[in-house]
Amino acid sequence: MSAAEIDEGVFETTATIDNGSFGTRTIRFETGRLALQAAGAVVAYLDDDNMLLSATTASKNPKEHFDFFPLTVDVEERMYAAGRIPGSFFRREGRPSTDAILTCRLIDRPLRPSFVDGLRNEIQIVVTILSLDPGDLYDVLAINAASASTQLGGLPFSGPIGGVRVALIDGTWVGFPTVDQIERAVFDMVVAGRIVEGDVAIMMVEAEATENVVELVEGGAQAPTESVVAAGLEAAKPFIAALCTAQQELADAAGKSGKPTVDFPVFPDYGEDVYYSVSSVATDELAAALTIGGKAERDQRIDEIKTQVVQRLADTYEGREKEVGAALRALTKKLVRQRILTDHFRIDGRGITDIRALSAEVAVVPRAHGSALFERGETQILGVTTLDMIKMAQQIDSLGPETSKRYMHHYNFPPFSTGETGRVGSPKRREIGHGALAERALVPVLPSVEEFPYAIRQVSEALGSNGSTSMGSVCASTLALLNAGVPLKAPVAGIAMGLVSDDIQVEGAVDGVVERRFVTLTDILGAEDAFGDMDFKVAGTKDFVTALQLDTKLDGIPSQVLAGALEQAKDARLTILEVMAEAIDRPDEMSPYAPRVTTIKVPVDKIGEVIGPKGKVINAITEETGAQISIEDDGTVFVGATDGPSAQAAIDKINAIANPQLPTVGERFLGTVVKTTDFGAFVSLLPGRDGLVHISKLGKGKRIAKVEDVVNVGDKLRVEIADIDKRGKISLILVADEDSTAAATDAATVTS
């Protein structure tokens, strides 16, 4: 539908997502009511309960000294959106959650390349979550809201950009699925793009298989193979087109109301005269340098050439040294791409489908529960696995549906990994994003908590970087998890693909007709990532894709090219999996330093007895046995210890309380005196089960004046149950020495 003016100066448009038997979703955009002082502001609604405000602003003056585009995207989660008060000490929102940071990246990735090159004004997009249905996700709605507000801001922006989540449920791709629907899906994909010449150009993809994919596929669901994923990208296009159309109609209506379009100055990285001079003096030497295989040696030689070129052109372009450096980078990009497109050879001499030398090794960190070192060329990743009790799962306080996370994947990228200096400390957005990608790749193959009752922390240390440390992290993590004894459903490997393209003259054409030429690269280097047209990361098992991430600088990639890239990635993935299998092909025995966690069930009405007043009972069991104990609300008890006897002792004590075997007359025990009184001694038979030896029974037929003359607290006595009264009180007698050896048993073991 076209835009409607619902109030003076207030316009709205809607886009309807028709999912057939899965229902429809309505996305509504409104402008002119809120945040009127922003350059562009849009309120986006998903059905009735989900409401976001996106505001885009631009600085008045450009930052001419910047050599990059200063775009900032912030997502503000407001807890009132879900009717909650923040759980922090000050009861207000603090640093952004992981969900918010990942949404910022989802917005930034398709929007950043859509701004004109050379823009140096600071642009800020702030998305505020105002209302959220717990059954929905807000990230994709935020992409559309951010695009719409930017489109309204009068900025040099080639939008609008539409974003949609599609999930494969019962063989159908469903747009804007609910959280419940995603749980029934085998694959979940966020796709963003814009309309170019009547078709949708895909600019960004973030996708993963769901947690239940293996079980669903075994039950007959369609596996997310490469061809299925490619079909999902095509299925997303009509939804994206509808969203882009609605945004454009809103911008057209708001523009007619008199909002001026602003002209922003553009600062090219270099002038044509500078590029001509640099190419004339540096082409031959630079082309030779780009044949050096080693990254460090190649970079050193290019730096030497740059210094020589800057010195040589210093007088001609005084004060324009930055332009000379930028022109040299542009020339480098041109030469790299020419060699790939024309000769099908790459910087390091590989062919377009060749993978760098691979190496895999496990058990490299002595006391770690699991560890591995994975190397692909100069990319080197150390993976380390730590296992702990389920109670160590991460607790999440955000607007997302997830409240705890049992598997945590943390990615670190220290500056020395690229031979540089820099800040170390808290993770940056890039590190959080890479860790999340590796996590999504592995979650589908993790065992359930019933099969493996542990919290798992996986850390990926990027010790060397020259192309796709995130996919290297997937490989290293698979190896480390297997080394830790985690029974993965299947090993997972990942590979980064690239794409280089240009326009060539069609042979025999007389009117200058050109066609697009594409070359897909396997296992891209860092330079190929920077100079190429696509960064395409694919992770999966030998049978299906578990995670996928795509960013492209082109106005769309033909579906057949994308399908070919997926198949090329599968070939590489299978090769890597073979190398990994040589290092480890099944779960190892668990490390002696890892806790042994056992699961038992107790009746819900017995939980209080196991815990005891103020935790007295459970703390006593922990202290006596050295085991860690965690109790869930449903009566599931996790008992963990680094040695089996400690765990078993704790289990026996818990069972004695929660699942007691009532003693009977005639049973014998080796008990501990826990209390003495004037009339006798109380002996502990089982946890929570004591009996009394009357003073008259302590003297073995002789009269004694004081209990302490015979026994004291802590003494061991061999006793027999003589009587149990109606109230359950147990009377004991001492077992004669001649009978004790054959008859008495340990207090933890009852003999009938």
From Swiss-Prot:
Cofactor(s) needed by this chain: Mg(2+)
Residue ranges of domain KH in the record: 595-654
Main subcellular location of this protein, as a coarse class: cytoplasm
SMART domains: KH, S1
Pfam families in the record: KH_1, PNPase, RNase_PH, S1
Record flagged with keyword Transferase: yes
Subcellular location, record wording: Cytoplasm
Segments passing through the bilayer: none
EC numbers, comma separated: 2.7.7.8
Alphabetized InterPro entries for the sequence: ExoRNase_PH_dom1 (IPR001247), ExoRNase_PH_dom2_sf (IPR036345), GPSI/PNP (IPR014069), KH_dom (IPR004087), KH_dom_type_1 (IPR004088), KH_dom_type_1_sf (IPR036612), NA-bd_OB-fold (IPR012340), PNPase (IPR012162)
Assigned keywords, A-Z: Cytoplasm, Magnesium, Metal-binding, Nucleotidyltransferase, RNA-binding, Transferase
Function statement: Involved in mRNA degradation. Catalyzes the phosphorolysis of single-stranded polyribonucleotides processively in the 3'- to 5'-direction.
Protein name per the record: Polyribonucleotide nucleotidyltransferase
Lineage of source species: Bacteria, Bacillati, Actinomycetota, Actinomycetes, Mycobacteriales
Gene this chain is encoded by: pnp
